[in-house]
Amino acid sequence: MKNIFTILTLSITVSLVAQTHEITKHNGIKMEVNFIKTANNLVYYTLPQSAEEKSISQFAISQLQEKSKTEVKTISKKITLSGKADYNKVIVLKPSQTEGLQESGIITSFLGKTKGETNQSFLDEAEKRLKQNAALKGSPFIVIVSNKPKKLKAVMYTYK
């Protein structure tokens, strides 16, 4: 009976250890976690000593390493901006996708809507303007708060 209990305990322990992963953030910080899944630009995980599910933006993570296989998976590449011309690299996120990123300020802009301009073309131009302002300030991520004519506003995010 003791042998069966010992074997059962070891098999459960080995399966838990096999699920252990190491997350490496873009700022170099490493976290030991139990990886669950990736969905909607978020990485879901639990801490080894807890069962509470947590999430972090996939853009804050550089690599995910599975400890049992020493397999390394690249989650995202670090975005570096060199000026306003790199506005295409700026990513627009939803507020829920910013976990693990650091808020770096608010940008505002003015953009008048011309007569006959469609709503979609106005929204595209507004997004472009906000991305250019964020790239100029070196922030690779934005969350658009307001895209109304005469009141464009976004929150900028960078790596922690």
Could you say what each language-model-derived stretch is?
Residues M1-E22:
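Bacterial Sec-dependent N-terminal signal peptides
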Residues Q19-F141, V145-P149, V155-K160:
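Compositionally biased alpha-helical segments
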